[in-house]
Amino acid sequence: MKLYQKKSYSLIVLLFSSFLLISCKNKLKKPNNQERINRLISYVKNKEGFNYKIIDTIKYKGANLYRIKMSSGEWMSDKVKGESNWQHWLDIAIPDYIDTNKSLLFIGPGSKYDDEIYLESLSIEKAIKTKSIVSHISNIPYQPIKFISNDTIDRYEDDLIAYGWNKFLNGGANDEDAEWLLRFPMTRAVVRAMDVVQEISSTKSKPVNSFFISGASKRGWTTWTTAAVDKRVIGMAPLVIDLLNIVPSFEHHYRLYGDWSPAVEDYVNYSIMDWMNTKEFKKLLSYVEPYEFKSLFTMPKLVINGTIDEFFATDSWKFYWNEIPEKKYLQYVPNGNHGLLGSYQNQNIFSFYERLIYSKDLPELEWSIENGSFNIKVEKNIPHTVGLWKINNPKSRDFRIWEVGRNWEKKEIGTSDSGIYKIDVPKGDGYTASLVEIVFYPDSDSPLTLTTGTSISPDKYDHQPYQSSLK
């Protein structure tokens, strides 16, 4: 912009230019992702239909477990058969001695027919050890659900989610249809669970005021969306939802396998993949895709994935990791499929959680994969071990469990006083997958395991891109 040189005009010109600039910006303003996330925020704030009741109190040595039946709200009452008010079991472990206002909430699966306690004994033990309240909400999403329109099928999990996506996309991706996206009521249910935990703890010595949340698979996705809409979330551990930046991630998926994995069959059945790169699909993602509002995730994050996942390629991290804000920590579980390996990941979550709530330093770890090497820098003077994990598939670039089994192998790497490591990316016949694992405080009762992303060598495709059937 050319500036006027006459001093007498400069202030007037500056003010007038600023006014024009602001006016133009307002006129040109278009719906953006902040407006879409605001719709989700508004949705979860609605407490219509919300209520809860304490059903039982179970005494453990060192803690009480509250069993609560919670209704999180109505969903599609004019379109579903039977109960449209989502029902959940919320189990809350309250230790006899509480030393923090922070709390851990697990987001779990289940069905409306279940009534067992999902909060495992390890969680109760950790509540006592960390002197913090630990809870678990089940039946996320509420399921099964039948729909009125000639539906005789009990819909669960991905079939239920894909059904709603299909309705939204084929209906023109209108704003008023956003509730079809099941992440809306799933996120609302978790927010209501936090409300209940706060109310139950309000009479305790340290009432809960913030949460660390964790869930797996579609509950992992809901972990992200809950963190985006509720400021009470001060940390999170989403598990096995290795698909942020979903379009390039799934384009990658197809070029690796030449087909869609059976694990995503429900989405294939509704032709969801054909909608990728359409304006309708972009609209869908703007509502519920964490990558679309990634700037909101400034809280500490421990992202846990499996290396032999049935749903996601083991190097999917590269489509989102570098763009996610700090502080962020990654763990790929060697030989971990979509269900991971039992307590392996939970122990790591508790280690991370304990360090976070008591303001213990989280280890500094920098890593990159460049020029055929893992380049790693570990903070000095922190006890740690280093290992290189690898697996080979001589036939194809496919590391799903049914192709390679649980055959990742580990090689110990000697520790360096400098904390700096340069480790060659392994190669072999066909394709080789590898990662570097660093275990911090290995001799303590709460070690913390972190890894680099997975590297695949050679980095090339065997198949052509997916061709949508939509015209």
Where are these regions (language model features)?
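Cap/lid segment of the alpha/beta-hydrolase catalytic domain
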Residues: 111-112, 134-191, 243-256
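Short beta-strand element of the alpha/beta-hydrolase
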Residues: 89, 101-110
